[in-house]
Swiss-Prot record:
Disulfide bridge map: none
Keyword match Iron-sulfur: yes
Cofactor: [4Fe-4S] cluster; [2Fe-2S] cluster
Cited function: Catalyzes the conversion of dethiobiotin (DTB) to biotin by the insertion of a sulfur atom into dethiobiotin via a radical-based mechanism.
Name under which the protein is recorded: Biotin synthase
Sequence positions that bind [2Fe-2S] cluster: 100, 131, 191, 263
Recorded catalytic activity of this chain's protein: (4R,5S)-dethiobiotin + (sulfur carrier)-SH + 2 reduced [2Fe-2S]-[ferredoxin] + 2 S-adenosyl-L-methionine = (sulfur carrier)-H + biotin + 2 5'-deoxyadenosine + 2 L-methionine + 2 oxidized [2Fe-2S]-[ferredoxin]
UniProt keyword Iron-sulfur present: yes
Organism lineage: Bacteria, Pseudomonadati, Pseudomonadota, Gammaproteobacteria, Alteromonadales
Pfam families: BATS, Radical_SAM
Keywords for the protein's UniProt record, in alphabetical order: 2Fe-2S, 4Fe-4S, Biotin biosynthesis, Iron, Iron-sulfur, Metal-binding, S-adenosyl-L-methionine, Transferase
């Protein structure tokens, strides 16, 4: 097979042509690309933790964390360090190689930056890759997080530029692109994808992938989310997307961003094993592991491992901690055992 060509000049009609291929042809092409670039049976596993929940000022119509919608979600302050580290240790023990931390903010406050940087350093000391999603970042904030050792920063484009105004009005598409530019310039790896099933048209799914594939450098990780409809949000009664259209989105993402990790992200709780298997065949090679994604349900870990065994898949190996790191982690855990610390960080206002 010839080497896969990496392009940053995709036209919308080219991508729409891929979407329109007969399913067998599309899956064959996507799987062929996948096998050239990755071990087709290896899946990178991440754990996602909400480190600050609810009370977000944005108006994303899909999101239960928006302060504008009555979804019954209890807002929480920024979590205490030991609470985060306990979750990170549990994630590593369960096989996750990357720990992702998300905060429901428009953007992080300067007063919280020192704490966030320490959080990155502490999680990395466990021998895990780190990722954060905190909203928009300035160039200086991106540089600070990069200097602290943050490996990945997530900031999704959500949908196409044309449909974007039907989803969110409190930040612009350019705001999102600017944050991605700041992240890339800082030296961190970019995690960016979107959500399908929000009432968009097929051309919007093509438009989302076009925006991602035509960035100066493809995102290192591309999460593709299926909308999880939450009562109280404007999108709670939106029509379901044909699951095969979701598979097509995964497949086209794999073809036009051949070297990126394509993450089968939110919505897996409502997917059959057969649908997930099709997504893995189409090129998905990353998942979030654990019973919750920020505030929405996710398959139980045992269910995922059972599916992996049935499909012959295996997790990507994580970063091995040194003996000194392991000893330091155990010592810290022992020191904290008798403390009755608050679950929240004192300075973290809602």
């Amino acid at each position: 097979m010839s080497d896969v060509q990496v392009r940053n000049n995709w036209k919308r009609d080219e991508i729409e042509t891929l979407f329109a291929l007969p399913m067998n042809d599309l899956l064959f092409q996507a799987h062929s690309v996948h096998r050239q670039e990755f071990d087709p049976n290896e899946v990178q596993i991440s754990r996602l933790l909400s480190i600050k929940t609810g009370a977000c000022p944005e108006d994303c119509k899909y999101c239960p964390q928006s302060a504008r919608y009555d979804t019954g979600l209890e807002k929480e302050r920024l979590l205490a360090m030991e609470t985060v580290l306990t979750e990170a240790r549990s994630a590593k023990a369960a096989g996750a190689s990357r720990f992702c931390m998300g905060a429901a903010w428009r953007n992080p406050k300067e007063r919280d930056m020192p704490y966030l940087k320490t959080m990155v350093e502490e999680v990395k000391s466990l021998g895990m890759e780190t990722c954060m999603t905190l909203g928009m970042l300035s160039a200086d904030q991106a540089s600070e997080l990069a200097d602290a050792g943050l490996d990945y920063y997530n900031h999704n484009l959500d949908t196409s530029p044309e449909y974007y105004g039907d989803v969110i009005t409190t930040r612009t598409y350019q705001n999102r692109l600017d944050t991605l530019s700041n992240v890339r310039a800082s030296g961190m790896k970019v995690c960016s994808g979107g959500i399908v099933g929000m009432g968009e048209k097929a051309t919007d799914r093509a438009g989302l992938l076009q925006q991602l594939a035509n960035l100066d450098k493809h995102p290192d990780s591309v999460p593709i989310n299926m909308l999880v409809k939450v009562e109280g949000t404007p999108f709670e009664k939106i029509d379901d997307l044909d699951p095969l259209e979701f598979v097509r989105t995964i497949a086209v993402a794999r073809i036009i961003m051949p070297k990126s990790r394509v993450r089968l992200s939110a919505g897996r709780e409502n997917m059959t094993d057969e649908l997930q298997a099709m997504c893995f065949f189409a090129g998905a090679n990353s998942i979030f592991y654990g019973c919750k994604l920020l505030t929405t349900p996710n398959p139980e870990e045992n269910d995922d491992m059972s599916l992996f065994r049935r499909l012959g898949l295996h997790p990507e190996q994580g970063i091995a901690a040194t003996k000194e790191q392991d000893e330091a982690m155990l010592a810290k855990a022992a020191a904290q055992q008798d403390k009755k610390a608050s679950a929240f960080y004192d300075a973290g206002a809602l």
